UniProtKB/Swiss-Prot annotation:
Residues marked Histone H3K4 binding (site): 245, 256, 266, 317, 335
EC assignment: 2.1.1.364
Full protein name: Histone-lysine N-methyltransferase SETD7
Tissue-specificity statement: Widely expressed. Expressed in pancreatic islets.
Top-level taxon in the UniProt lineage: Eukaryota
A GO cellular component entry from the record: nucleolus
Gene this protein is translated from: SETD7
Summary of subunit composition and partner proteins: Interacts with IPF1/PDX-1.
Consequence the record notes for mutating residue 297 to A/G: Abolishes methyltransferase activity
Swiss-Prot/TrEMBL keywords: Activator, Chromatin regulator, Chromosome, Methyltransferase, Nucleus, Repeat, S-adenosyl-L-methionine, Transcription, Transcription regulation, Transferase
Consequence of changing residue 220 to A: Increases near-attack conformations
InterPro entries, alphabetized: Hist-Lys_N-MeTrfase_SETD7, MORN, SET_dom, SET_dom_sf, SETD7_N, SETD7_SET
Length: 366
């Protein structure tokens, strides 16, 4: 973000003083192909100016005696933005970062261009990390916390570079000037980063998620022949994360090559990975660390599957409400099977889904 190091002027467009130095508003192109547009006073940047770097990023602010001072805006090549406080050309002081969609992803302090002090990292799903960063600006220490999307439930303890090593259930009681105050909850459950593999769903399959446990329960579904279903414990508004969908991680090829009977609890995570909750883990007596796989299908669902970065499970999907949901209401999602796969006459879906689809389409035509 500091482009002044060993930069050699290649071309100057604008007024020059008697010594041939940029003076007034000028555009200076450097040997690195970086470009600066702004005000100069006898060869030094003074006043508003903007760097255009070779990689597509930019840095804009107010220069005094050739150095950026005060508020500056660095725009990454992908469109993300860092708004920070500069002293003598380096980040020193409060800063905020935003992603390409304008969502806040970082809030904290910088010292000599490195994150410093208590910092917050925000995920698009609503969760966050908070704590005092180490000398390298990393979320490493004994007093770091992951805060769930309710901005209250937390896992507090030891993290290394943002990865939970040992967390205990806590409640975020208050935040004063960016500093959080946590209160540890009774109990001796310990949580740690436990990303599943193709063969291990969890090293502690019967340890429930504390956030999920407050919001959902499993009971007999109200949908005919659907078995168990997922229900809301509490009344919530729209866009609320209710449950998590963890499972073993397998490939799309593996899913596509086996019988539909084995794919009852599969959910695509991305182009490479499918999350699966196979036997015997579809029984809560064998696995209850996450319950999202218990949500049944509906063509008029009250929830959706959404991406989620979980402190324990890693990248997974969650179940998020589409609308307000009442206590004891069953949570449903659209399974999203392909209704018109190429080269096939009918949908690529299990038989029960095809039957329900025809019935639903019939009601829509009335």
């Amino acid at each position: 973000m500091d482009s002044d190091d060993e930069m050699v002027e290649e071309a100057v467009e604008g007024h020059l003083d008697d010594d041939g130095l940029p003076h007034g508003f000028c555009t200076v192109t450097y040997s690195s192909t970086d470009r600066f547009e702004g005000n100069f006073v006898h060869g030094e940047k003074n006043g508003r100016g903007k760097f255009f770097f070779f990689d597509g990023s930019t840095l804009e602010g107010y220069y005094v005696d050739d150095a950026l001072q005060g508020q500056g805006v660095y725009t990454y090549e992908d469109g993300g933005v860092l708004q920070g406080t500069y002293v003598d050309g380096e980040l020193n002081g409060p800063a905020q970062e935003y992603d390409t969609d304008g969502r806040l992803i970082f809030k904290g302090q910088y010292k000599d261009n490195i994150r410093h002090g208590v910092c917050w990292i925000y995920y698009p799903d609503g969760g966050s990390l908070v704590g005092e960063v180490n000398e390298d600006g990393e979320m490493t220490g004994e007093k770091i916390a992951y805060v769930y999307p309710d901005e209250r439930t937390a896992l507090y303890g030891k993290f290394i570079d943002g990865e939970m090593i040992e967390g205990k259930l806590a409640t975020l009681m208050s935040t004063e000037e960016g500093r959080p105050h946590f209160e540890l909850m009774p109990g001796n459950s310990v949580y740690h980063f436990d990303k599943s593999t193709s063969s291990c769903i969890s090293t502690n399959a019967l340890l429930p998620d504390p956030y999920e446990s407050e919001r959902v329960y499993v009971a007999e579904s109200l949908i005919s022949s659907a078995g168990e279903g997922l229900f809301s414990k509490v009344a919530v508004g729209p866009n609320t994360v209710m449950s998590f969908y963890n499972g073993v991680r397998i490939t799309h090829q593996e899913v596509d090559s086996r019988d539909w009977a084995l794919n009852g609890n599969t959910l695509s995570l991305d182009e490479e990975t499918v999350i699966d909750v196979p036997e015997p883990y579809n029984h809560v007596s064998k696995y209850c660390a996450s319950l999202g796989h218990k949500a049944n299908h509906s063509f008029t669902p009250n929830c959706i599957y959404d991406m989620f970065v979980h402190p324990r499970f890693g990248p997974i999907k969650c179940i998020r409400t589409l609308r307000a949901v009442e206590a004891d209401e069953e949570l449903t999602v659209a399974y999203g099977y392909d209704h018109s796969p190429p080269g096939k006459s009918g949908p690529e879906a299990p038989e029960w889904y095809q039957v329900e689809l025809k019935a639903f389409q019939a009601t829509q035509q009335k």
